[in-house]
Amino acid sequence: MEPWLRIWDTSTGQCLRTLVHEDNPPITSVCFAPNGRYVLAFSLDSCLRLWDYVSGTVKKTYSGHKNQGFSIGGCFGSVDGEPFIAAPSEDGEIVLWDVKNKEVVQRISGHQGVCFWVDVYEDIMVSAGQDGKIRVYKHHNPEAAKGINGVAAVNEALGDLMVTDLPLKSEDIKKEIIDLPLKSNDIKIEA
């Protein structure tokens, strides 16, 4: 793990920019914001940094999860048009932040041991953990979730770093009873 991000031009293979934070924390994973202008970096100092890679500056820093020894990664999502950042934590939780004000809006008990990864698609969130399970979460209000387009909502919100003023509530997302055990012999790859 290195303490910098490199932005590459995939058509030429050229490094366009190297981004380094003054604290130099090792970076474990990154993801693009859906609008393509920002990069969210997960680092071993228990912080997420939202980089504007064009200007080379950190626009926001999010703290409130634990990440000091594992490569973990999360994503952007949207509920009822409200964009958020979802990140796993070494204490097994999933932490959700309001993109604009950087506040933790929800903590979800996810896994026994480290939660390694979180991803969101429309009104569904999945997580994978050290306990060998993939957990699936679904927005509890299907009518409100109808037509959610996380890409469009986050794209629109991150364009000028704005989100709606409605906070996420703990009852907005509930755990569905779906725990999928992971075993190496469950995964078959065909050549």
Residue ranges and their predicted role:
Residues 31-37, 42, 75-82, 88, ...:
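Loop/turn segments within WD40 beta-propeller blades
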Residues 33, 44-75:
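A beta-strand-loop signature enriched in Asp, Gly, Thr, and Trp
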Residues 14-20, 57-64, 103-107:
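A short beta-strand motif characteristic of beta-propeller blades
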Residues 10-13, 53-55, 99-102, 140:
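Short loop/turn segments that connect beta-strands within beta-propeller blades
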Residues 1-19:
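Solenoidal tandem-repeat scaffolds enriched in leucines and small polar residues
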Residues 64-72, 81-83, 90-95, 100-191:
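Terminal intrinsically disordered, low-complexity extensions flanking WD-repeat/beta-propeller proteins
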Residues 1-2, 42-45, 87-91, 128-131:
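Conserved strand-to-loop turn within each blade of WD40 beta-propeller repeats
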